[in-house]
Amino acid sequence: MPRSLKKGPFVDQHLFVKVANENEKGTKNVIKTWSRRSMIIPDMLGHTIAVHDGRKHIPVFVTESMVGHKLGEFALTRTFRGHVKDDRKGKRR
């Protein structure tokens, strides 16, 4: 169920302060965060945010199409290495 519109988007306070400081200075430094639950807001456009995936920080460049999504959606936590090939035909001969 989506968040109520009257509440507005959720952004962790420490992340919001870091983005506001970068906007105020006019710089585009990488912002490191562990807050995967924070929603991407228009103030974050053009910034690179390093989102933690449980092991390392994945740099995510925020574009206009990402607004309204959560940061964790763009830093995958599981690595898929592919299925093992089933080689039954070779074993019969």
From Swiss-Prot:
<dbReference type="GO" id="GO:0005737">
    <property type="term" value="C:cytoplasm"/>
</dbReference>
<comment type="function">
    <text>Protein S19 forms a complex with S13 that binds strongly to the 16S ribosomal RNA.</text>
</comment>
<dbReference type="GO" id="GO:0003735">
    <property type="term" value="F:structural constituent of ribosome"/>
</dbReference>
<keyword id="KW-0694">RNA-binding</keyword>
<protein>
    <recommendedName>
        <fullName>Small ribosomal subunit protein uS19</fullName>
    </recommendedName>
</protein>
<dbReference type="GO" id="GO:0000028">
    <property type="term" value="P:ribosomal small subunit assembly"/>
</dbReference>
<dbReference type="InterPro" id="IPR020934">
    <property type="entry name" value="Ribosomal_uS19_CS"/>
</dbReference>
<dbReference type="InterPro" id="IPR023575">
    <property type="entry name" value="Ribosomal_uS19_SF"/>
</dbReference>
<dbReference type="GO" id="GO:0006412">
    <property type="term" value="P:translation"/>
</dbReference>
<keyword id="KW-0699">rRNA-binding</keyword>
<comment type="similarity">
    <text>Belongs to the universal ribosomal protein uS19 family.</text>
</comment>
<dbReference type="GO" id="GO:0019843">
    <property type="term" value="F:rRNA binding"/>
</dbReference>
<keyword id="KW-0687">Ribonucleoprotein</keyword>
<dbReference type="InterPro" id="IPR005732">
    <property type="entry name" value="Ribosomal_uS19_bac-type"/>
</dbReference>
<dbReference type="Pfam" id="PF00203">
    <property type="entry name" value="Ribosomal_S19"/>
</dbReference>
<dbReference type="GO" id="GO:0015935">
    <property type="term" value="C:small ribosomal subunit"/>
</dbReference>
<dbReference type="InterPro" id="IPR002222">
    <property type="entry name" value="Ribosomal_uS19"/>
</dbReference>
<keyword id="KW-0689">Ribosomal protein</keyword>
